[in-house]
Regions:
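Short aromatic/basic micro-patch
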Residues: 124, 167, 406-409
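Core alpha/beta nucleotide-donor-binding catalytic domains of modification enzymes
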Residues: 12-164, 173-188
Length: 455
């Protein structure tokens, strides 16, 4: 991989940077040759891998897959945001990839027969009820407003029958392994039980992108599944020590090298009765049985905690910044507002009252870095990153001239390893929201590189 950072060039009023070249040998021209910005559905060749992308957002999975290989061809995609009339993500997706084969409607209303058969189904199914910005106690898990979309994945796979895809690549928040608070690990157990009943072997790993040299500290649960009839499944079945698959032989360890954390392993069975799992899995226990890495086959779970093992180069927040001269004035913090930002970022202890019970309690929080460090990966981008109002969670940097400012949309895109101005056309506030919902495309690219070689 080529991590050399290219110099920025000026073209008219735009600042152009080639973030793709930081993570691979691909250039903008080469990306266009691979069809990343084509406006027609790609022609399918003999060795191509037909992809269906659900909950596509602005196309993070597609970008990662197509950077990994030109043979990943997305033939159908779906993106629908029920909470807004203006479908920003879908509009951006179509602008880059074309409207043909794209569905902008509630996936629950799309008949399975209208979704073409594919080799790989991918998607980051949204469970924002228990995202990083929400406390686990308030989480609805799969029962939550958006979490029920998991059942649309299950419905599509089940109704496809013998024509269901051989491979799955899925993404969710890291807390999925521990939710809900009242029944730790139940939601993830439901997912594994569902996929086991359909004949899939499932690998998972909680990955922090910054641990592998990427410029954002973003922890997410990634899953790769392969059907029992595949070559990968046959290789897994032959392995006597299944924990070797987690540490060395599987897709995840070959995409992201790791080592055992403490040598403590766990193995147990999950029922293929989804209702039984929903009602009784891990009931009454305080901790989830799932560790940050694992594999499940035939209802048998093997899991352990791993640590990243990486000695390559690291990108930092400072590496992805645009020149101060091209930052719009509204992104700079005025002297009169600076004190408000310092307060938000500082430590505090406050008395609060529960609106439901009237119970008074002390709420405290520690200080955060102010400004954000430029010599390390950024903090996690959240959906509330945009807007001028002071916030504890938004990024603030100090420029070379000594001024303080927020991050501009291009910088947020770079932190997720998207092409510059990928979300151009939406408001700055909305662009920040979209990047707060997106994944780090470099994670998908690395997984896809290994998956392609072992299919």
């Amino acid at each position: 991989m080529n991590y050399k950072i290219k110099d920025m060039e000026m073209e008219g009023n735009w600042v152009l940077c080639d973030p793709i070249a930081r993570y691979s040998n691909t250039t903008h021209q080469r990306v266009r040759e691979l069809g990343l910005f084509d406006n027609i559905r790609p022609e399918i060749e003999v060795n191509d891998i037909k992809v269906v992308e659900l909950f596509a957002g602005v196309g993070g999975f597609r970008i990662g897959l197509e950077r990994a290989s030109k043979h990943f061809k997305t033939i159908w995609s779906n993106q629908w945001e029920p909470s807004t009339k203006h479908q920003d993500a879908s509009i951006i997706y179509c602008r880059h990839f074309g409207a043909e084969g794209h569905s902008n409607e509630d996936i629950a209303t799309v008949p399975t027969e209208e979704i073409p058969d594919s080799d790989l189904l991918c998607g980051g199914f949204p469970c924002q009820d228990y995202s990083v910005a929400t406390t686990l106690q308030r989480s609805g898990g799969i029962e939550g407003k958006k979490g029920v979309l998991w059942w649309q994945i299950y419905r599509i796979l089940k109704e496809k029958g013998d024509k269901r895809p051989d491979y799955l690549m899925l993404e969710n928040v890291d807390r999925l392994l521990n939710s809900p608070a009242k029944q730790r690990g139940r939601d993830f157990a439901i997912i594994l039980s569902s996929l086991s009943s359909l004949g899939y072997i499932v690998e998972w790993r909680v990955i922090n992108a910054a641990d592998y040299g990427m410029p954002q500290r973003r922890r997410r649960t990634y899953m790769v599944a392969y059907h029992k009839g595949t070559q990968l499944a046959a290789q897994f079945e032959k392995l006597s020590n299944k924990f070797d698959w987690i540490l060395q032989e599987g897709i995840m360890p070959q995409a992201f090298n790791c080592q055992e954390k403490d040598g403590k392993t766990n193995s147990f069975d999950i029922s293929d009765d989804i209702a039984e799992v929903s009602d009784n899995f891990n009931k009454g226990k305080k901790e989830s049985p799932f560790k940050n890495s694992g594999v499940m086959a035939n209802g048998k779970v093997y899991t352990l905690d791993t640590l990243p093992k990486y000695d390559g180069p690291y990108l930092t927040l400072g590496d992805i910044l645009v020149d101060e001269m091209v930052v719009p004035e509204e992104f700079f913090i005025s002297e009169e507002d600076l004190q408000k930002w310092e307060y938000q970022k500082g430590s505090k202890s406050l008395k609060r009252i529960n609106k439901t019970t009237g119970f008074e309690y002390n709420y405290s929080e520690g200080a955060m870095a102010f400004p954000d460090y430029l010599d390390r990966a950024s903090r996690t981008i959240i959906t509330g990153e945009g807007g001028a109002g002071p916030s504890r969670f938004k990024h603030i940097i100090k420029t070379e001239s000594g001024r303080y400012r927020r991050l501009v949309p291009i910088e947020l895109e770079r932190l997720n390893m998207f092409p510059d101005n990928h979300t151009f056309g939406s408001s700055d506030l909305r662009r920040a929201f979209l990047m707060g919902n997106a994944l780090v495309t470099g994670i998908v690219e690395n997984i896809a590189l290994v998956l392609k070689e072992r299919m």
